[in-house]
Amino acid sequence: MTDISILNDIQKIIVLDYGSQYNQLIARRIREFGVFSELKSHKITADEIRDINPIGIVLSGGPNSVYADGAFGIDEEIFELGIPILGICYGMQLITHKLGGKVLPAGEAGHREYGQSALRLRSESALFAGTPQEQLVLMSHGDAVTEIPEGFHLVGDSVDCPFAAMENTEKQFYGIQFHPEVRHSVYGNDILKNFAVNICGARGDWSMDNFIDMEIAKIRETVGDRKVLLGLSGGVDSSVVGVLLQRAIGDQLTCIFVDHGLLRKNEGDQVMDMLGGKFGLNIIRVDASKRFLDLLSGVEDPERKRKIIGNEFVYVFDDEASKLKGVDFLAQGTLYTDIIESGTETAQTIKSHHNVGGLPEDMQFELIEPLNTLFKDEVRALGTALGMPDEVVWRQPFPGPGLAIRVMGEITEEKLETVRESDAILREEIAKAGLDRDVWQYFTVNTGVRSVGVMGDGRTYDYTIAIRAITSIDGMTADFAQLPWDVLKKISTRIVNEVDHVNRIVYDITSKPPATVEWE
């Protein structure tokens, strides 16, 4: 059996996309159980599902009514495939509507629910095995089921929802009116695991080790003896892609690392030493710092900064790529979330596909995106499985424009140096305190504000540095990290004593929303 054939034998649970903001969380939670899961369009046909051969199907939630014009439907032959189905929120209403039950708009049914609610189990169910008879769940629905289809029976209700959970054990169809994928549903993970393992019979055969074997085989089959180009940023995603490609095709890979002069302290050298030295990647380092800083001189508007950096990065990359001969493929660190966030027919675009969108139209490469089925935490797990050290795998997220958006106002060498040095101190002290895995993201910002201070016997008028540290689960929302006061005090003392032109430290205690993580 070839490594590629293993991919076809891996058990899969597919999630049909009906537009819920939580869709990717469903797939992510299922993967945590060692079961491969991915989103598919709600327009998928029964024949297409037969080709995929999943062990289970989840119908996601969504913002629409089953009675609305253009409401998202389902190929009803899917109900005849003999595959277990779990309908979540809109998915439960769709099952009910298509199989002969009744769904009413909230105004008529009187059962609108938003927020946490107490679910009461009225009968035993394999879906709820090991969970308490009463449990908190997250409800978010306008319409409501008022009559369940023939062959189904009631499993659970809530004060405002007479049919909060239902099942047809003969067909292995299950419907729940709440969202088990979010953490506000206290036993949601147990419910999803019961569906995957106890009902669908998942054996948990999805792991990073078999992903590596399959992806290497896939890369070798796709590339053959041709050459691949990778734009290396030093971040986690492109670094993991580089190491994976190196293992797959060796010296057929060439990496271009554009140093725009906006990196963190010693970051350029660390990239070269680690990826070029330890892992043997063939890296062309381009020192374009003067080129970028000259273009940014006098620019204060953050959007102009971003556009200048983005455009110039493409020009520099294109210049270097044009010097290479016989390259057929461009590799990118596109993640599954990038593809989802690019927008689907069921959801608005959150952001454009940043990896592809900025490339010149005349760059005629075939794309290789080895990580495009993985979430961020899975990329870190992949890096660890590839033998990459923690300092690379757990590197702090870093924006494409680099320190340019952590310097408020005009960018100068002096301001950049204050951020580089203060950020290095912050990262060092967070690590020393053992908090580097607990805090989602942390960095410093030169606020562009000067204030009066006293150092020694002299008056100073220097920059104010802000510390930003957040906790989060998925990055969509965030709270400021409540760092211990002694740690903050040490960080502040070190920065004002060790970093020139800084005399004041402030701590950003704003959540997201209303603030964003980055200041610009």
Swiss-Prot record:
Residues 206-395 form the GMPS ATP-PPase domain. One of its GO terms (cellular component) is cytosol. It comes from the Bacteria. The active site is at C89 (nucleophile), H179, E181. Residues 12-205 form the Glutamine amidotransferase type-1 domain. Keywords: ATP-binding, Glutamine amidotransferase, GMP biosynthesis, Ligase, Nucleotide-binding, Purine biosynthesis. GO terms for molecular function: ATP binding; GMP synthase activity. ATP binds at S233, G234, G235, V236, D237, S238, S239. Its EC number is 6.3.5.2. Signal peptide: none annotated. Homodimer. This is GMP synthase [glutamine-hydrolyzing]. It comes from Streptococcus agalactiae serotype V (strain ATCC BAA-611 / 2603 V/R). The lineage of its organism: Bacteria, Bacillati, Bacillota, Bacilli, Lactobacillales. The gene is guaA.
